[in-house]
């Protein structure tokens, strides 16, 4: 019989909540997964993201329960402590945002620890710079980096990229997760775009999709069509089955009528050897509408000037995509609880400093 049960209420940004239906198909999938899993063969996982995000709750916590694997939880991200835990607890996997695995790879004390058990380098919640993929693979012996894409509204279901596919397509968040998740691209009128590499909004159809926003029918209708497809709010395209994210619809910077993808600019900046962290965003500007900004954390013992970075980016980006305002320092960038960079806080800093 069909069961219509309120399973979870997730709240984010302090103002929005959602609920999700669970029917027999969900329960059966969980049961099948549990039956197929042998706890003694499951490596321990380092859990370093909050449980109030689906990456932490679903990909980390619930899947660990289903698989019967040991889960080591960190109350706050600390790469030095994480390295110690990986050694002491024989951690085999990590689930978190991509910056966390990068923190481990570039930590000055990494070689002091026995990390031989550390193999599964999962990431989600934010893009991983393509050039980091091979560096992670080479830096952790016999490891397998992976990246996933999903949203709170899809209960983390979406795409997955791992193994040779990830090495060959490091800029992609992967293919749709089989067998029940479908991913498509639409235009602003809900027309599906079948041509490869045509940019539109990413939509996801899956039994894992939420029922809707709690007590907000209008907002729910805005993101679903009659066939159950959910509008992600992310711009992207599909090429040979692989999904590529261009940017959040709301995070595109529009400068003098030109659309600028923050992810594209960040990817170019991350290719500079001195850059540890980078966040690109826009702030209001009277004449052009928005000014493109970047905040950068430089690697320890490395140096980087604004002019050096501008010169470096000249043959990688169109002139209008090179940030006009730069903040280059050795301090880590501010983050929200999920581990992502807080671009809202960075915008406020730039505006309050009179950088516009």
Briefly describe each language-model feature range.
Residues 6-47, 52-93, 107:
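Conserved AMP-binding/adenylation subdomain of ANL enzymes
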Residues 66-67, 83, 88-96, 105-168, ...:
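Gly/Ser/Thr-rich phosphate-binding loop
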Residues 94, 183, 206, 211-212, ...:
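AMP-binding/adenylate-forming catalytic core of the ANL superfamily
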Residues 109, 117, 142, 179, ...:
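Glycine-centered tight turns that cap/initiate beta-strands
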Residues 125, 150, 174, 234, ...:
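Active-site glycine-centered loops adjacent to acidic/histidine catalytic or metal-binding residues
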Residues 175-180, 191-223, 258-260:
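Conserved ATP/PPi-binding loop(s) of AMP-dependent carboxylate-activating enzymes
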Residues 348-356:
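Acidic/polar alpha-helix N-cap and adjacent early helical turns
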């Amino acid at each position: 019989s069909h069961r219509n049960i309120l399973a979870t209420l997730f709240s984010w940004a302090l103002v929005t909540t959602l609920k999700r239906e669970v029917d027999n198909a969900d329960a059966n999938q969980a049961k099948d997964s549990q039956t197929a899993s042998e706890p003694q063969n499951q490596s321990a996982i380092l859990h370093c993201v909050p449980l109030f995000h689906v990456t932490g709750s679903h990909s980390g916590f619930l899947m660990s329960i289903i698989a019967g694997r040991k889960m080591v939880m960190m109350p706050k991200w600390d790469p030095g402590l994480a390295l110690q835990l990986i050694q002491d607890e024989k951690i085999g996997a990590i689930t978190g945002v991509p910056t966390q695995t990068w923190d481990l790879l570039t930590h000055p004390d990494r070689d002091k620890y026995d990390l031989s058990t550390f193999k599964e380098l999962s990431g989600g919640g934010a893009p991983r710079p393509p050039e980091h993929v091979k560096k992670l693979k080479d830096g952790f012996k016999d490891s397998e980096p992976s990246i996933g894409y999903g949203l709170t509204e899809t209960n983390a279901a979406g795409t997955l990229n791992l193994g040779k596919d990830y090495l060959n397509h490091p800029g992609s968040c992967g293919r749709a997760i089989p067998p029940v998740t479908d991913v498509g691209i639409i235009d602003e009128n809900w027309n599906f775009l079948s041509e490869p590499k045509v940019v539109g909004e990413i939509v996801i159809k899956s039994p894992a999709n939420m029922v809707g926003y709690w007590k907000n029918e209008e907002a729910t209708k805005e993101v679903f069509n009659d066939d159950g497809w959910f509008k992600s709010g992310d711009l992207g395209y599909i090429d040979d089955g692989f999904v590529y994210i261009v940017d959040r619809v709301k995070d595109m910077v529009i400068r003098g009528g030109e659309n600028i993808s923050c992810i594209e600019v960040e990817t170019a900046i991350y290719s500079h050897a001195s850059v540890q962290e980078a966040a690109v965003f826009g702030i209001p500007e009277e004449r052009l509408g928005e000014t493109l900004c970047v905040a950068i954390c430089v690697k320890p013992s490395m140096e980087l000037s604004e002019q050096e970075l501008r010169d470096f980016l000249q043959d990688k980006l169109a002139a209008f995509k090179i940030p006009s305002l730069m903040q280059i320092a050795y301090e880590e960038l501010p983050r929200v609880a999920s581990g992502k960079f807080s671009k809202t806080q960075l915008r406020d800093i730039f505006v309050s400093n009179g950088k516009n």
